[in-house]
């Protein structure tokens, strides 16, 4: 039995805590809202982020980070990307032994454009890190909470570490594959949020299935293009954390990014959308980070650039569609030296 603390009591952190508890592990969950932690402990529900789902009685919630981390050997980080450094800086003052650091957040750090595993390795001393592992894939918290069949990927530099996390989570409704491509897995999970925003805009504008299919397909091309430039394996983007996550995020009403894009397509401002959502929409921050990365690394990402102009430069969504459709003629298939 593993002693594991989930850092972050949002919908995804809560759902993953359920999986771990169902597997018989000693599970704690930490959140910074005492009233929510009390509700989890007394009513066995997280009514704010995962309403209607009864949580296992073995999950213990804490609002004290120090108490939540007593004697743990594994932590699972599920917090917004912008909060990582603050949380990690607190944690490194509490943790005293090397532990496994798993993260299940899908984003790129604002300002630095770094992957979350890079942030962890920068903030946590090497003496406190046993392994850093990423857990990602097409997975809505609402469906995991209902024990609906879900499949994700565990990625780490050491395959033994990825397999260890696979063993932690795998059960009859939650299947885990392994992948050594931590760069590709992280980028696929983060960048698909950009395309989900664009797909939501397309649906909000009523552009139809043809346009949405094109956005998803060409969007995957952009993800793979930047991912390969940053060291990811092109094949990863055809897997669960690339194509798989893109499909589920672009087509489901559970997707925050799709819902946010849908509101933008219907004429709402970004400020109205973010206020209405009440939860983190990682795609907004990721669009900015990816646009900066693309310019820095000279990678062509036209959908990302068009969305960036809508979100941050006030461009009209209909004009953005026109600019994409009117681009110079191109070949569809690009030669990838690694594969050809």
From Swiss-Prot:
Keywords: Cytoplasm, Lipid biosynthesis, Lipid metabolism, NAD, NADP, Nucleotide-binding, Oxidoreductase, Phospholipid biosynthesis, Phospholipid metabolism. It is found in: Cytoplasm. It is an enzyme of class 1 (oxidoreductase). It catalyses: sn-glycerol 3-phosphate + NAD(+) = dihydroxyacetone phosphate + NADH + H(+); sn-glycerol 3-phosphate + NADP(+) = dihydroxyacetone phosphate + NADPH + H(+). One of its GO terms (biological process) is carbohydrate metabolic process. The active site is at 192 (proton acceptor). Belongs to the NAD-dependent glycerol-3-phosphate dehydrogenase family. This is Glycerol-3-phosphate dehydrogenase [NAD(P)+]. The gene is gpsA.
